[in-house]
Amino acid sequence: MAKSKFERVKPHINVGTIGHVDHGKTTLTAAITTILTRKFGGEAKSYAQIDSAPEERARGITINTSHVEYETDKRHYAHVDCPGHADYVKNMITGAAQMDGAILVVSAADGPMPQTREHILLARQVGVPYIIVFMNKADMVDDAELLELVEMEIRELLSKYDFPGDDTPIIIGSALKALEGDKGDIGEAAILKLAEVLDSYIPEPQRAIDGAFIMPVEDVFSISGRGTVVTGRVERGIVKVGDEIEIVGLRPTIKTTCTGVEMFRKLLDQGQAGDNVGILLRGTKREEVERGQVLAKPGSILPHTKFSAEIYVLSKEEGGRHTPFFAGYRPQFYFRTTDVTGSIELPAGVEMVMPGDNISVNVNLIAPIAMSEGLRFAIREGGRTVGAGVVAKVIE
């Protein structure tokens, strides 16, 4: 039989499991694929298959991640599960696996634990927009009051980090029972309930093409008689011939007009998210544009020098620093296509940051970069990656 081509009929959503070690994230992932493939087709993955997560590299950092996919009634899901806590931290900070929503797994027997809290905080910092809770191992708790207490604790913790704790869906079940074929409320029924909630609670994300136009500048050429051409890959939105464009970052913002879009040496009417294009700019001199700036829809993005960020510092084993750094540390921050030097302010009471740590910091850049919350960057020393980060909040 001929291999069937991937039919994208259903909308595609990216999710992942987060939560404390041994609370059942991987078992739940296995249970979801097993039960949903039985109902909607696809390929079931066992615990062992998911647990042997292959290594990937994102922004020069090695991360172990398992990717599974499944379908529900309405959607197609790509789901990530990580073997270790450090992998989650790295995954969320580098944005290697962007999540439209997360399934927070909490053991009903233990309640929220340190990594539960840390993953919720990380989700807030890196901009995971929605969290659904699966209260796992319900077969180990006989006392209904205890379940209620754990549920209250989870809701309080979510609210503390600005998620809507009172309105967050919490599904009570046992991933192991479901995997063993239990058809009861906490078995298969709980997994099917989770699938329904994924469909109804996580809205369809805005596609990259629907956002405001932005393109990081990779290269600039002048073509005699035609003007200046800027090349890059459109990150978001659409650019059409005749559109007004701002050139943002590194120096004062200037306005110009797109007089041509070309791809593979052909002239187009427009370029859109994902396209590698050359954009011809009217009346702009070659030396007015440089790598590291962005072309953007006027007013849609501003240049900033100061922001708070969540960063992960590579361990020595990962090729990072061998020694800690202190307040005032001045590495380069690599945004999109260029490095900008900046200094790091540590939180009150923190003396130093060790290789392998993740921490919230403030950064002051020496030149402004076009940025908004959720933008990823690498931290480098002389071209070598020593960390990764994500903009949590723009300050000025």
Curated annotation (Swiss-Prot):
Mg(2+) binds at residue 26. It comes from the Bacteria. Keywords: Cytoplasm, Elongation factor, GTP-binding, Hydrolase, Magnesium, Metal-binding, Nucleotide-binding, Protein biosynthesis. It catalyses: GTP + H2O = GDP + phosphate + H(+). Residues 81-84 are annotated as: G3. One of its GO terms (cellular component) is cytosol. Residues 19-26 are annotated as: G1. GO terms for molecular function: GTP binding; GTPase activity; guanosine tetraphosphate binding; translation elongation factor activity. GTP binds at residues 19-26, 81-85, 136-139. Residues 10-206 form the tr-type G domain. Residues 60-64 are annotated as: G2. Residues 174-176 are annotated as: G5. Its main location: cytoplasm. Its EC number is 3.6.5.3. It is found in: Cytoplasm. Residues 136-139 are annotated as: G4. PANTHER family: ELONGATION FACTOR TU, MITOCHONDRIAL, ELONGATION FACTOR TU-RELATED. GTP hydrolase that promotes the GTP-dependent binding of aminoacyl-tRNA to the A-site of ribosomes during protein biosynthesis. Monomer. Belongs to the TRAFAC class translation factor GTPase superfamily. Classic translation factor GTPase family. EF-Tu/EF-1A subfamily. This is Elongation factor Tu 1. It comes from Nitrosomonas eutropha (strain DSM 101675 / C91 / Nm57).
